[in-house]
Amino acid sequence: MRIKKGDLVEVISGKDKGKRGKVLRVIPKENKVIVENVNMVKRHQRPVPQLREGGIIEREAPIYASKVMVVCPACDKRTRVGYRFTEDGKKVRYCKKCGEIIDKD
């Protein structure tokens, strides 16, 4: 999976098409990601004394990774991600449109 936690992604299909958000969690076994303010669902929550109050809460639900694309921080366009090795032998992700390195490390 070429998407990592903290990446800025854009939804390319579905009811939230065009929305951008930060990846909060990656679920590789299910090939899904949870994106900030995308695919919001309402959940009924029971009250737990001393911990939280009950009611209806809104939270993000997982979305298939194939429905999102990484947004390049340099060119601000959604792009495919490639891998290359730097001079010191480190494997990094790069934008296939502009060639800039996506990983901040």
From Swiss-Prot:
Transmembrane residue ranges: none
GO-annotated molecular function: rRNA binding; structural constituent of ribosome
Keyword Lipoprotein tagged: no
Keywords annotated in UniProt: Ribonucleoprotein, Ribosomal protein, RNA-binding, rRNA-binding
Source organism superkingdom: Bacteria
Record carries keyword rRNA-binding: yes
Record InterPro entries: KOW, Rib_uL2_dom2, Ribosomal_uL24, Ribosomal_uL24_CS, Ribosomal_uL24_KOW, Translation_prot_SH3-like_sf
PROSITE patterns for this protein: RIBOSOMAL_L24
GO biological process: translation
CDD domains noted in UniProt: KOW_RPL26
GO CC entries: cytosolic large ribosomal subunit
Disulfide bridge map: none
Quaternary structure note: Part of the 50S ribosomal subunit.
Listed PANTHER family: MITOCHONDRIAL RIBOSOMAL PROTEIN L24
Task of the protein: One of two assembly initiator proteins, it binds directly to the 5'-end of the 23S rRNA, where it nucleates assembly of the 50S subunit.
Family: Belongs to the universal ribosomal protein uL24 family.
Protein name stated in the entry: Large ribosomal subunit protein uL24
